[in-house]
Amino acid sequence: MFAKVTSLGLSGLAGYVVQVEADLSSGLPDSAVKESSERVRSAVKNLHYPWPSSRITINLAPADVRKTGPVYDLPLLVGLLAAQGVLPVPAPHQAFLGELGLDGTLRPVTGVLPMALAAVTLGVTELFLPAENAAEAAEAAGLTVYPARMASDVVRHLCGEEAITPAAPGGFDEAGTWLGPDMADVRGQAEARRALEIAAAGGHNLLLVGPPGTGKSMLAKRLPGILPPLTYEEALETSAIYSVAGLLPAGSGLLKERPFRSPHHSVSTAAMAGGGSTPRPGEVSLAHNGVLFLDELPEFSRDTLEVLRQPLEDGAVTVSRVHGTARYPCQFMLAAAMNPCKCGYLGHPTRECTCTPSAIEQYRRRISGPLLDRIDLHVEAMPVEYEALAAEAGGESSAAIRARVTAARKVQQERCTDLPGVRCNAQLPGAALRKYCRMTPKAQQILRAAFERLGYSARAYDRILRVARTIADLDGSEQVDTAHISEALQYRALDRKAM
């Protein structure tokens, strides 16, 4: 007696079909039963279905791909019951996912959204899974999702006794009014506010430098409120990563807000880039389409900071481990904050810095030149004057800034329709950069003079052009002129030869 049941697996965010094969043959039962089979055995008995008295052989194909976790409990149960003739053998277009409790309840599993999205392209049209996973799976167009709370619900459906009502797609609406921290709460800091707007409009990386208490963290935490809402495609990508990581809220569909990740400076390289015996997304991937905020940047270990270089450049990270390799997207905005020196008061108008020149240089060298090169905007946040703090009216609201940012992003997306995967100026490749960042002759002269005097790298040159293009977009200008280049140059204050 033999039965084959379709299930799904994941490699990174790529789904693939897993065939769960169950064969019952004459002979004594195998005593070497793994944990998953023990759960299935208990569930079968507690649901009062027969357990085979003969030898059971289970195969999960393809055999050369490592399969872990409890996701195959439900297809194992269905396969064993089908092999005994308790229920019809499911059709190949029907797939099954889910962990079994010992009493036969179905518990949610991770990675359902990317598996459901892949299932449609792999010929699967029906998916049976735990009810808590139904909302995310229903986002896959062309897939009928059957949510169940007990394994017995699935058995009765397959036997034609009691049909399961398919889950309805939740639909996707862009996030409405921002209810988080608002830029209107920020007093003063006009230059930093302007830099945040430019960073949000073009997707640029940002470094805030200033003494303690000047509002660097406060400003960074308001970045999500001025970023444009997630598009449907971005929401799918981001939600898929959170599904794999097990961070998608139970019973919810797609995420609607851009992620904001703020790991502690003690974070390991594996936690930052991704890792584990079975590769899992790290902080850089969890910040995909959102913001990765690193407060007290020099306090992070050198290895942890250096691991950011490749993700910042490529927008993707490959995690290699003994049991497999996974590739995750990580197109994020890096926002970082740091003190100007170890004591924190270099350049403070009223407090004296106690650091020696060599101590200041040593402190700043904790951030390597190549990493600093990849940060587009270097901004000073100085203490706010009393008049600004005491003023009744705050600054401009996040909603007003977001409207300008969204308009600038729309211009960029229309400009880049012929560039797959490019959504903002920060992602413009070299050839497109020269095409779309045409400068006036005077602007070229200013950039050339700065390049020769300060010794910018080729990477810094490209990033200055991208920032200038974003400033021009905010101004509604087709061409990059002297004002745009000059403002972009002022945000490179921490380049090594400019210090």
Q: What are the functions of these language-model segments?
A:
Residues 103, 294-301, 344:
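Catalytic P-loop NTPase motifs of RecA-like helicase/translocase cores
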Residues 289, 295-296, 307:
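Walker B catalytic acidic pair
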Residues 159-198, 202, 229-284:
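P-loop NTPase nucleotide-binding/switch module
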Residues 208-249, 314:
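Walker A/P-loop
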Residues 1-207, 211, 217, 320, ...:
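Peripheral, non-AAA+ core regions of ATP-driven protein-machinery
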Residues 210, 274, 296:
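The Walker A (P-loop) glycine that initiates the GxxxxGKT/S ATP-binding motif of P-loop NTPases
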Residues 28-37, 50-52, 59-69, 278-279, ...:
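Basic, amphipathic alpha-helical bundle interface domains used for macromolecular binding and assembly
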